[in-house]
Regions:
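Conserved small/polar residues in nucleotide/adenosyl-binding loops
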Residues: 337-344
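N-terminal Rossmann-like NAD(P)+-binding subdomain of aldehyde/semialdehyde dehydrogenases
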Residues: 1-119
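Glycine-rich beta-alpha junction loops
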Residues: 52-53, 209-211, 240-242, 255, ...
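Conserved small-residue-rich beta-alpha loop and adjacent elements
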Residues: 104-169
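NAD(P)-dependent aldehyde/semialdehyde dehydrogenase
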Residues: 263-310, 319, 326, 332, ...
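Conserved NAD(P)+-binding/catalytic subdomain of aldehyde/semialdehyde dehydrogenases
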Residues: 175-262
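Short acidic-hydrophobic, aromatic-tinged amphipathic segments that line or gate anion-handling sites
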Residues: 4-7, 179-183, 303-307
Length: 344
């Protein structure tokens, strides 16, 4: 069960602290996987798919027939929503495209700057029991807008050896060039060094678990990466007027990503705190990834009670007021203000 705390009784380091201890052998495991993929290529990827995902893979690359089947069986309303989301994302990222320029400072002196897109980008998309079409759209479309000529996507297959059709539909909608059935650290290694089937890319983007993050860190330098993504985290600021079911759902939207995720609620209502605590116990068993959400909530989850909404809660390096002024928050990755929240 998620733990309740009184803000006055907590030290700042206790608010920030979370148990992110990983398996001690992560580094060694990832080193071994990278070495195997470099040495044996596709053969190693197929063995890891069977070992980690229970999937027997004959052909690593997703065929056009598989993509066509995914579209044929997809709900038309979902496809329309997918296309609308893709259009919105593309519209936003077109505003970020850098402009080339030339300056003629003096006769005979010409200065300028030209932006050239990388040739190949690799996009990692998590798989397993969860499907993240949003990850596909938000990682692939910026590359497409930038003019990247080849976008290679990797994602683990299910036990049936097939990629989630939602992911395939999103990938085709976004403009992925090639899709491969491989995940985890082995997929990162394949994108960095190449295999018989998978081309080596110039940059790898996309989130993943601690093995994926560790692999990205280790191949950085051979290939560019977007960032080392830590475990998911969410801070919900809610008063007594909020719906506890919605608050609990928001917390679980991140808790179900990773057992190391940190779902945190800050409220000035003891009644809401208790209600959310109870609601979490109702909702967690209903989740497909209930075991992961349970580990996250029980280990790293917090409900912090404050006396008045003007109290400041220290989160990472930001001073975030419950009556939040978005312009004063410097480190939040994403701010969502509404009820219910659109988070995931």
């Amino acid at each position: 069960m998620i733990k309740l705390y009184n803000f006055d009784e907590l030290r700042p380091e206790e608010i920030l602290n979370r148990d992110i201890r990983a398996e001690k052998n992560v580094e060694d495991v990832v080193d071994g996987i990278i070495a195997e993929v470099r040495a044996r290529g596709d053969e190693a990827l197929k063995e890891y798919a069977l070992k980690f995902d229970g999937a027997k893979i004959d052909d690593l690359q997703v065929t056009q027939a598989e993509i066509d089947e995914a579209f044929a069986n997809m709900d038309p309303y979902f496809l329309e929503t997918l296309r609308e989301a893709a259009a919105n994302i593309e519209s936003f990222h077109r505003q970020q495209v850098h402009k080339n320029f030339v300056i003629n400072e003096k006769p005979g002196i010409v200065l300028g700057q030209k932006y050239t897109p990388i040739e190949k980008a690799g996009v990692y998309v998590p798989g397993g029991t969860a499907a993240y079409p949003s990850t596909v759209l938000m990682d692939v479309i910026p590359a497409k807008v930038a003019g990247v000529s080849e976008i290679v996507m990797t994602t683990p297959a299910g036990k049936d050896g097939r990629v989630n059709p939602v992911i395939l539909a999103a990938a085709a909608t976004a403009g992925v060039t090639k899709i491969f059935k491989t995940g985890g650290a082995q997929a990162v290694a394949a994108l960095a060094y190449g295999t018989q089937s998978i081309p080596a890319v110039d940059k790898i983007v996309g989130p993943g678990n601690i093995y994926v993050a560790t692999a990205k860190r280790k191949v950085f330098g051979k290939v560019g990466i977007d960032m080392i993504a830590g475990p998911s985290e969410i801070l919900v600021l809610a008063d007594g007027g909020c719906n506890p079911a919605w608050v609990a759902a928001d917390l679980l939207s991140q808790a179900e990503h990773d057992k190391l995720a940190s779902p945190v609620l800050v409220t000035d209502s003891a009644e809401l705190a208790k209600a959310v605590q109870a609601e979490l116990e109702v909702q967690i068993p209903q989740l497909p990834r209930a075991a992961i959400a349970r580990a996250s909530v029980d280990t790293n989850g917090k409900i912090i009670l404050i006396v008045v909404v003007e109290y400041i809660v220290v989160v990472k390096t930001a001073g975030v007021k419950v009556n939040i002024s978005a312009g004063k928050v410097s480190v939040a990755g994403c701010l969502l203000y509404t009820s219910p929240s659109p988070r995931d």
